[in-house]
Amino acid sequence: MASGREIKSKIKSVQNTRKVTRALEMVSASKIRKAQEQMKISRPYAQAMKQMTGHLAQANTDYLHPFLIAHKQVKRIGYIVISSDRGLAGGLNNNLFRKMLGEMRQWQDKGAEVDIVTIGQKASVFFRRIKVNILGSVTHLGDTPRLEQLIGVIKVMLDAYTEEKLDRVYLVYNRFINTMVQKASFDQLLPLLAAKDKVAHHDWDYLYEPDAATVLEHVMRRYIESLVYQAMLENIASEHAARMVAMKAASDNANKLIGTLQLVYNKARQAAITQEISEIVGGAAAV
């Protein structure tokens, strides 16, 4: 059995770790509220862009934007993968990567190749380690990312699709359901799926200035950028929620371990006292 001093040292070490996990839990609880507010603020813009894009896609124009054209054969797939920059978030990133690998294997079994761009340090490190072809990467965006920080990697994928180097593009991220539930999501970005709304049958059209191609090019790109940005905010909220839950579990486990070590310490101390009494009694009897 370990000595009382060693056990005391272990208890102190676990108590120090518990202080860290409790602090991280409280910080994440605070940040998750801010992340949810950011999600709410950005949604009206994303919804307005979706509605406008749906109207333009169904309008009477002779011009069909490349993002609306489905390629006949699917030989190369592109993924925009969003992860966190930091760890200590439970299995959030690993669960996403595991499902991502499953999706990649399905396409590879069909003879398709895979290219990706990564947003977040964890995704960049993971996919470089397993030798996936990475077209672009952006990291260390913080808790309040700006859209202009994402435009570069998004443009890489959009240009590749326009040039027919990619046949489909998917967006991969953790969707925030609630504090306890985050879901790995795979959304098809390209080709854009036609919106099913009340304007499906109409006899109207827009007046385009300077022309339909220029307007559609601008709107389609802004729309896809808004989707990626919204997914980024969802992933940030998911990260803080997962970290808060993970740190709460770590603090609870620390409490249990401290209780167990305290019991062991008490038993060791009791055994030492009993031995000392026995030695004193034995010495007195010998005299």
Curated annotation (Swiss-Prot):
Bilayer topology annotation: Peripheral membrane protein
Quaternary structure, from the entry: F-type ATPases have 2 components, CF(1) - the catalytic core - and CF(0) - the membrane proton channel. CF(1) has five subunits: alpha(3), beta(3), gamma(1), delta(1), epsilon(1). CF(0) has three main subunits: a, b and c.
CDD domains named in the record: F1-ATPase_gamma
Name of the molecule in the record: ATP synthase gamma chain
NCBIfam families registered for this protein in UniProt: ATPsyn_F1gamma (TIGR01146), PRK05621.1-1 (NF004144)
Cystine residue pairs: none
GO molecular function: ATP binding; proton-transporting ATP synthase activity, rotational mechanism
Keyword Cell membrane annotated: yes
GO biological process: proton motive force-driven plasma membrane ATP synthesis
Main location, first listed in the record: membrane
Role description: Produces ATP from ADP in the presence of a proton gradient across the membrane. The gamma chain is believed to be important in regulating ATPase activity and the flow of protons through the CF(0) complex.
Keyword Protease in annotation: no
Family the UniProt entry places it in: Belongs to the ATPase gamma chain family.
Species the sequence originates in: Xylella fastidiosa (strain 9a5c)
Pfam families the UniProt entry points to: ATP-synt
Subcellular localization: Cell inner membrane
Gene Ontology CC annotation, any one: proton-transporting ATP synthase complex
Gene name per UniProt: atpG
Keywords: ATP synthesis, Cell inner membrane, Cell membrane, CF(1), Hydrogen ion transport, Ion transport, Membrane, Transport
